[in-house]
Structures are given as structure tokens and as C-alpha cells.
Curated annotation (Swiss-Prot):
Cited Pfam families: GatB_N, GatB_Yqey
Protein name per its UniProtKB record: Aspartyl/glutamyl-tRNA(Asn/Gln) amidotransferase subunit B
Taxonomic lineage: Bacteria, Bacillati, Bacillota, Bacilli, Bacillales
NCBIfam families assigned to the protein according to its UniProt record, in alphabetical order: gatB, PRK05477.1-1, PRK05477.1-2, PRK05477.1-4
Entry similarity comment: Belongs to the GatB/GatE family. GatB subfamily.
Keywords: ATP-binding, Ligase, Nucleotide-binding, Protein biosynthesis
Organism: Bacillus thuringiensis subsp. konkukian (strain 97-27)
Gene name, Swiss-Prot/TrEMBL: gatB
GO molecular function term, any single one: ATP binding
Function (record text): Allows the formation of correctly charged Asn-tRNA(Asn) or Gln-tRNA(Gln) through the transamidation of misacylated Asp-tRNA(Asn) or Glu-tRNA(Gln) in organisms which lack either or both of asparaginyl-tRNA or glutaminyl-tRNA synthetases. The reaction takes place in the presence of glutamine and ATP through an activated phospho-Asp-tRNA(Asn) or phospho-Glu-tRNA(Gln).
Amino acid sequence: MNLETIIGLEVHVELKTNSKIFSASPTEFGAEPNTQTSVIDLGYPGVLPTLNKEAVNFAMKAAMALNCEIATETKFDRKNYFYPDNPKAYQISQFDKPIGENGWIEIEVDGKKKRIGITRLHLEEDAGKSTHTADGSLVDYNRQGMPLIEIVSEPDMRTPEEAYAYLEKLKSIIQYTGVSDCKMEEGSLRCDANISLRPVGQEKFGTKAELKNLNSFTYVQKGLEHEQVRQEKELLSGGIIQQETRRYDEATKKTILMRVKEGSDDYRYFPEPDLVELYIDDAWKEEVRASIPELPDARKARYVAELGLPAYDAHVLTLTKEMSDFFEATVADGADAKLTSNWLMGEVLAYLNKQQKELKDVALTPAGLSKMVQLIEKGTISSKIAKKVFNELIEKGGDPEEIVKAKGLVQISDEGTLRKVVTEILDNNEQSIEDFKNGKDRAIGFLVGQIMKATKGQANPPLVNKILLEEINKR
């Protein structure tokens, strides 16, 4: 029996508002536990929620960027459940009238594009955060009442790789809109994955398992890969898949049962009595739509059409708004687009990945990178020398021209000076000349290496090659 994998994702995104969704409590990350909460967040008797309009605007903005239809009439509902991190014993969410529906985004895996549907996008409040220790459990209610959007995909993904690509694209779009920073390490983007298997050709879905506590896109992919294998083994051996919630354990690289999955009936949804229905007219929608900036796909197309970048470069540069904005500022300062792209995708990304940092954490600026790239273009420094300048720029900052002067890194492009060096090297390496004339091309590489060594890497490489061949042909 051949089985087909069905994957759908539920993504929670914390909105970057200054106050919480139903109270004036601040939303700063990293504050002392239980210092950013109020009687409204904690559900004290007699208090009433007040809807944060900015949260609604942000939700609409995200929904529009994800090609959703925006509701004209929407409302809030109570989702009833009891956990220690939920002091009210209910969560204010949206059940049957979400703010956005029927959206989609396009992903690309192995060169093939695919549209993934988005069932709905709705607003809700976040819960507190529980921390379990050997001595007991602690609860921080700072997160309680933070504004969230939940984005529910259609079950359109068929592989864990597609799920990864979907998350990467979704994160990129949301970051570009500016409604969230989408930092998984800070909990501002969280993902639950639903996966089931069914015989190829069957329309009815199989019984799904939900994977929770997936704190990176890589864990989402690995968790789905393991669950795919687990369910396949169970079904092929005649077993039955139970509807349950599981978590991915990185140590064992397996998914582990957490609990039997609840259905929506278990939450006893009913309309939130303390909030009126919300009506969104066309003028409000257009006001929000006008605030949406250029999104990654449009920016990618512009890089290819206007700047002449390869599609791959454009894709990598637009994955994050931070990198794309840095690229734009560097090119706007006069640097060549392709050369800038090469440095950002090469040395810059390699440094950031190795140091586990973001662009905002390093001393390199668009103006600094632009000046360095222009020095390469002018022939003042070679690409090899530029790496020494780059190391200084990204660690300490500064002016590339001043760094080049202070360290004596100016490229030697004077033909007379280089010809003297070449002549001296050839005089001391007659065997290499013979080897080259006898067809051993590697000999030229050796000679170039000796010249670069003699000039401390500062010789102009194209000019060295030209002079070297001229001098060899004279002998």
C-alpha cells in the first residue's frame, strides 16, 4: 500500500504592539516576571477588556499580505479551558468569524513552485508561560494577554520539506509587513504541525497527530519526518493511528506522546459577552492596505529585472527584511549590485552564522560595505585584500579607505614595479618556466603564488598574469 502524507500547520505570531490586546499593560520582552500584567490580564471580577485597535490593524495587514479575504463583520469568542498559565480559565479568541480567510502563499521546493492555501487568520490573546523545575512549577503572566494572530494553513503540504519552505516564506512575509519580528527564540513565532497519512488516491483524510513545542523550523521538519515514519510503520503493520498530541524530543530524535487530543467541542466556545461585534468597512480596509510595504516576492522580481541579479541571489537576499534592507542601502550608496550580493551571501552570512549573530549585532554598516566594494571596483584593493578589510569592518567598523592606508593594503597596480618582481621570480625559477612551456599549466599557478607572496598579496592579480605571460614568452 502506497501512502500519501498530509501536513497542515498552525502558526502563532505575536504582534509588535506597544500594549496588550485587551489592556494597557506593556509588551516589552525580557522584563522581570509578573511585572507587565494587570487585573484585566488576570481576569479579576468586574474588569472589562478594551480592544486594541492597533492589534486589529496589524492582523488585517498580515491577512492582506497573505492574500486573505478580510471580514466585514467579525467577533470574539471565549475558549474555555483550565491550565495554570490561563488565570481566567478562558482565552479570548475568534471561533466562527475570523478576521481573515481563504488566503494563500507560494513556496518553492527543488525548483518547483506550489501554492499553499491559508484557511484562516484570527486574533486572540496569548497565555502566560509555565516553567517547571525540580522544586515545582512557576508561572510568569507577562505574556498573558499579548496580542496573537493564529494562521491556519490548508492541509496542502505533502512533505516535511514543503512545511519548512512554507514556514520560511510565511516568516519572511510577516517580517516585511512589520507587524512582528517573528523571533522563535523569544516566542514571538510558534508552530504546531498536524500530520496524517492516507492511501494514495483516497480523498478522506487519515487520523492526524499534532506536534507541539517545535522551537525551530529545523525541529518542525525533523519532527514531521519522524512522525511520517512512525505512522507509516503503524499503518503498514495493520495498526490504527490515534488522534493525539505529541512533542518532538531532540535527544532521542523521536516524537513522544503528550496527551490525547481534544476537539473543539471540549473548549465550549461561546461569544465573548464583554466585547461587541466588530465591523470593518471598505475605508478602513483600504487605509490598512495602503500601509503594506513591498513584499519579498515583489522585491525579488525587482532585483532580477532592475538590478540584473540571478534569481538565486535575489531569493537569498530577500529571505529576511534585515538583509534585503542592508543590500538596498549598500547599493544606494554606490556599490555594484552583484559584487555587493556576493559579499553579503558569502563572507557576511558566513560570519553571522558562525557567530550566531544578526546584522544589527555587528559593526558593519551599509556605507562601510559600499566603500569597500567600490575600492575593489576601482582596483585599489583586490578581493583577497578586501577580506582583511572586511574582518576589521565587521568587528570594529571604521572607514575602509583609512583601514587600507593604515595597514598598507593598497593594491600594487604599477606595471613597472610588478615587472621587476616578476622578473626576479622568473630568474629564480627557471625550472617552472620550462615546465610551463612543456604543457604543465600548474607551473603558472606556482609562479603567481611566489609573486603574491613577494608582494604580501597586494599585487593586482590580472596584471600579474598579463606581465608573467609576457615575460615568459621573452625567454
